[in-house]
Regions:
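Alpha-helical transmembrane segments and terminal signal-anchor/GPI-anchor hydrophobic tails
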Residues: 38-65, 173-305, 349-366
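Membrane-interface alpha helices of multi-pass inner-membrane proteins
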Residues: 115-116, 149-174, 286
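Short acidic/glycine- and proline-prone juxtamembrane loop motifs at membrane-interface regions
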Residues: 120-127
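Membrane-interface transmembrane helices that cradle and orient dolichyl/undecaprenyl
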Residues: 132-148
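Signature aromatic-anchored transmembrane alpha helix within multi-pass, membrane-resident enzymes
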Residues: 191, 321-342
Length: 366
């Protein structure tokens, strides 16, 4: 039932430039899908039971329990709660794009391709990512002294909703490295190597602690919820991590060339704090390469990086001096399609089909 508007919105978004009407339609569509969702993975197993008993679920992030309790207190049924929270999260994500100066309409079109619908399945991470993204955008673009308080508050909230949002803090690295000198950069490099080693040694325990018992592997092509992965699956994960590090680098490099600052150090490229922050978070995620040969779970960190990178990608076609390849919208649509193919194809019937073919109209209020 919703396939036609879904495909039309993606297609129309390719030709829109910061269209408020288009952005509004995407936000409403995502809210509608969230409201009508009664059959997608995790709905009846995780999210509905958690909503009905928010403080009775073991190891649930406290911020999510608070939100669920608030929704129930004001009389919302879970689907109504999910609809409102989706709309708010989409507004925050659009605000992230607006603040960093990207084409919000193209960014939302890319988001619809991937990870839009998957975000409604792994819902907490989506909400946390939207909150964290707008917090970073505010820090990067605001000149008010209170920006640090706003950023800190939003980041704490994001981490309380889903603890994987802590990875968004790596987007602050450019500012830190620019001010720390060579010694500080060595310390950061050693710290990242240590993080990689800790992940590799404790991957099984950390995957459960970070993502819960209902792990990402259920959706990423591993049968029965096992968090193992084949050699080819690990190679696929590593290639996608590398792609998401290289492509933002090339985008930043081209923008620096336009500015005439390419000959300077990376931190002096004058491309803006947001593009550099997006680049660094995706580069840092390369520490996951060893562990993604053991489990798919940690690719969910890349979801945060990809969600932010869509804002950078949507800038490229709007540059005054376009690049032959990097300013081509088809390139970024293809990247999203590749992610969608690898991470949704095997679970198409538990993600896209139930979300876009709702079987009933659930109540909005209790």
């Amino acid at each position: 039932m919703l396939w036609v508007p879904y495909i039309l919105l993606i297609f129309i978004g390719l030709f829109c430039n910061n269209s408020k009407i288009y952005d509004f339609c995407v936000i409403v569509f995502m809210g509608l899908v969230a409201w009508l969702n009664t059959g997608a993975a995790d709905y009846s197993v995780v999210y509905l039971p958690t909503y009905l008993n928010p403080f009775g679920v073991y190891d649930m992030d406290l911020g999510w329990s608070w939100l669920c309790a608030l929704g129930a207190r004001v009389g919302l049924y879970y689907n109504g709660f999910a609809c409102i929270l989706t709309v708010v999260s989409m507004i925050l994500y659009r605000e992230f794009g607006r603040k960093i100066g990207t084409n919000t309409s193209f960014m939302l079109a890319l988001f619809l391709v991937f990870p839009g619908l998957m975000s409604l399945v792994q819902f907490r991470q989506f909400v946390a990512s939207a909150v964290g993204c707008v917090g970073l955008a505010h820090l990067w673009t605001s000149k008010m002294k209170s920006r640090y308080v706003v950023f800190g508050t939003l980041m704490v909230l994001a981490i309380l909703i889903h603890r994987s949002a802590v990875v968004l803090l790596f987007a602050l690295l450019p500012s830190f490295l620019a001010a720390s000198g060579k010694r500080g950069r060595v310390v950061v490099l050693l710290a990242l190597m240590a993080i990689g080693c800790i992940l590799f040694v404790n991957w099984r325990t950390l995957s459960v602690q970070l993502f819960g018992e209902m792990r990402a592997s259920v959706y990423l092509g591993v049968s029965g919820g096992s968090n193992g992965v084949s050699v080819l699956g690990g190679l696929r994960n590593a290639i996608l991590l590398l792609l998401m590090a290289v492509l933002p680098y090339l985008c930043n490099r081209y923008m620096a060339r336009i500015k005439g600052t390419l000959g300077k150090e990376l931190f002096e490229w004058e491309v803006g704090r947001a593009p550099l922050g997006i680049l660094f978070i995706n580069v840092v995620l390369l520490v996951l390469v060893p562990v993604v040969f053991l489990t798919n779970d940690f690719m969910r960190f890349e979801r945060h990086g990809l969600t932010m990178a869509l804002g950078l990608f949507a800038m490229m076609p709007s540059l005054k001096k376009r690049a032959p390849i990097l300013s081509c919208k088809a390139l970024y649509v293809t990247v999203c399609l590749v992610f969608a193919y690898f991470y949704v194809a095997n679970t198409f019937d538990s993600v896209y089909v139930p979300l876009l073919n709702p079987q009933s109209i659930p109540p909005f209020f209790i």
